[in-house]
Amino acid sequence: MASVSELACIYSALILHDDEVTVTEDKINALIKAAGVNVEPFWPGLFAKALANVNIGSLICNVGAGGPAPAAGAAPAGGPAPSAAAAPAEEKKVEAKKEESEESEDDMGFGLFD
């Protein structure tokens, strides 16, 4: 979980981005000081450097666009490639999802007191 210092810097950077102002250490410090939050001195510089060459708008839009989940187990040493082992696991997941969706379609929630 993020600390208060990290959250203050994050919110400051988002405010600056929303106002279409360049994110700098001084501007982050100014917002944090105006909010009355005590922050360790390295946080604003760290966030300013991290966000210097980043398109914050695209970063916000792509937050939930992660890759596929890793396979359930690791392949044993000298075993088949992970992609070959992951294919049956993916088929099982798809079948399980289909079964769950069929069950949810059948049960409309009318049996609350059964």
From Swiss-Prot:
Protein name per the record: Large ribosomal subunit protein P1
Provenance organism: Rattus norvegicus
Any Pfam family matching the protein: Ribosomal_60s
A GO MF term: ribonucleoprotein complex binding
Phosphoserine PTM positions: 101
Name of the coding gene: Rplp1
Chain positions covered by the region annotation Disordered: 69-114
Domain of life: Eukaryota
Basic and acidic residues bias (residue ranges): 89-100
